[in-house]
A protein has these predicted regions:
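Metal-dependent C-N hydrolase catalytic cores
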Residues: 2-114
Length: 114
């Protein structure tokens, strides 16, 4: 887990992104992967809360080891950009899905999408 510095006092802070990557590991231009948080639970029939999922995944990722011993590889080496969370579209899941498609299309710029 890395740290960044903010402000004139250079107070160390932990980056708020997937795996807590430093700026050079997580900028949009050079990253090969993008995480798009989609906080949406517009169709919850019992209890809302799915919208907290992206936050929980990013929070948990901050505790992960960034090394895969089987592959002898660190995913952060490819760069992973964490996009800002998408604003929920409460008109229904079709509208939210279209919002996700637009965001993915904008970020992918012709690259492969998984």
């Amino acid at each position: 887990m890395g740290s960044s510095h903010i402000g004139a006092s250079n107070v160390p802070v932990t980056p708020w992104n997937f795996l807590s990557l430093l700026d050079y590991q997580s900028d949009l231009i050079s990253s090969k992967a993008v995480v798009i948080p989609v906080p949406y639970d517009g169709t919850a029939s019992y209890r809302a809360g799915a919208r907290e999922g992206p936050w929980a995944v990013i929070q948990a990722s901050r505790e992960l080891e960034d090394y895969d011993p089987e592959l002898d590889w660190e995913p952060s080496q490819m760069g992973i950009y964490t996009a800002p969370p998408l604003e929920p579209h409460m008109a229904g899941p079709e509208h939210m899905l279209e919002r996700v498609r637009r965001a993915v299309g904008t970020l992918a710029q012709g690259e492969d999408v998984v």
